[in-house]
Swiss-Prot record:
The gene is PKSG4. PROSITE patterns: CHALCONE_SYNTH. This is Polyketide synthase 4. The active site is at 157. It is found in: Cytoplasm.
Length: 385
């Protein structure tokens, strides 16, 4: 049966990203948020929220949900109103559409006919429906009805690493497979008005944005038709951090998605990340974490700061993660793929020798509910100028 398996490692062959057109400027968001939620009388809470926004290091975010939507669905702005139906009515339509936009860009960069796509993986924490966003995205793209689909719900911020892990396994175990993997989250699922007793809600309102990212993954790139690897996916791993239960979570309730984020998350990640690195890179003989490039999910400024400090990383290691956080906020599962896209584009623009900022080896990290850590050892490819 070995003839059915690919001979080489899977690679990312193309990347596409998409965001809604509506933009939220972070400096203006506290005034906007308390106005549209009819909460301007909560002056002390508004000042707390302004400080959270100021410390976020986010400049702007994209958001599907605009003021017109809120006028049409006024109950969405109330703190715990039963609005799940109204939210899902929007999201079951908009999540596949935004995912399709990212996929179309990836397919265009790939340069091959979409009939060559054999598998589709879709992940989202924004919506649950049957048939799922995978089905609707496939229909919107006009993919073959026999494309093999995988739909994953409620992974959250580590989902970008998960889709790469599964895409790698599929591509390497099915010769000729071309896997379209897409992450899409739209935060209309958790937008609601403020409450004095729910400061975690304010953090979520301050940092989350909407986005979709898609990659095409395959082994044995066919350079005769123009396929070119961007990054090789060398190995993958997933772990649940010790003593982390309940630190990151999300719960589907009648009011929508209720988000949990414990203040100890940055410390938990920074205290455990080196063990993950040692397990991943000991087989390669690497122990200097400044000698690799980093594709890190920017869950928030505090996480990046703590990891940087714990591992004594040079400031430039998280430049792409910080850029994506600044320009888009935390887009959940798709964010780390935005960082991957930013890294390869910046490497080209700055004349680096490889897609990994001039380095050969790198790591991709996603962090999310559990607290779950997803990691991928990545190998860059030389850039030909």
């Amino acid at each position: 049966m070995n003839h059915l398996r690919a001979e080489g490692p899977a690679s990312v062959l193309a990347i596409g990203t998409a965001n809604p057109e509506n933009i939220l400027i972070q400096d203006e968001f506290p005034d906007y948020y308390f106005r549209v939620t009819k909460s301007e009388h909560m002056t002390q809470l508004k000042e707390k929220f302004r400080k959270i926004c100021d410390k976020s290091m986010i400049r702007k975010r994209n958001c599907f949900l605009n003021e017109e939507h809120l006028k049409q669905n006024p109950r969405l702005v109330e703190h715990e109103m039963q609005t799940l139906d109204a939210r899902q009515d929007m999201l079951v339509v908009e999540v596949p559409k935004l995912g399709k936009d990212a996929c179309a860009k990836a397919i265009k960069e790939w340069g091959q006919p979409k009939s060559k796509i054999t598998h589709l993986i879709f992940t989202s924490a924004s919506t649950t429906d049957m048939p799922g966003a995978d089905y609707h995205c496939a229909k919107l793209l006009g993919l073959s009805p026999s494309v093999k689909r995988v739909m994953m719900y409620q992974l959250g911020c580590y989902g970008g690493g998960t889709v790469l892990r599964i895409a790698k396994d599929i591509a390497e175990n099915n010769k000729g497979a071309r896997v379209l993997a897409v992450c899409c989250d739209i935060m209309a699922c958790l937008f609601r008005g403020p409450s004095d007793s729910d400061l975690e809600l304010l953090v979520g309102q301050a940092i989350f944005g909407d986005g979709a990212a898609a990659v095409i993954v395959g082994a044995e790139p066919d350079e005769s038709v123009g396929e070119r690897p961007i990054f090789e996916l060398v190995s993958t791993g997933q772990t649940i951090l010790p003593n982390s239960e309940g630190t990151i979570g999300g719960h589907i309730r009648e009011a929508g998605l209720i988000f949990d984020l414990h203040k100890d998350v940055p410390m938990l990640i920074s205290n455990n990340i080196e063990k993950c690195l040692i397990e991943a890179f000991t087989p390669i003989g690497i122990s200097d974490w400044n000698s690799i490039f980093w594709i890190t999910h920017p869950g928030g400024k505090a996480i990046l700061d703590k990891v940087e400090e714990k591992l004594d990383l040079k400031k430039e290691k998280f430049v792409d993660s910080r850029h994506v956080l600044s320009e888009h906020g935390n887009m959940s599962s798709s964010t780390v793929l935005f960082v991957m896209d930013e890294l390869r584009k910046r490497s080209l623009e700055e004349g680096k020798s490889t897609t990994g900022d001039g380095f050969e080896w790198g790591v991709l990290f996603g962090f999310g509910p559990g607290l779950t850590v997803e990691r991928v050892v990545v190998r860059s490819v030389p850039i030909k100028y």
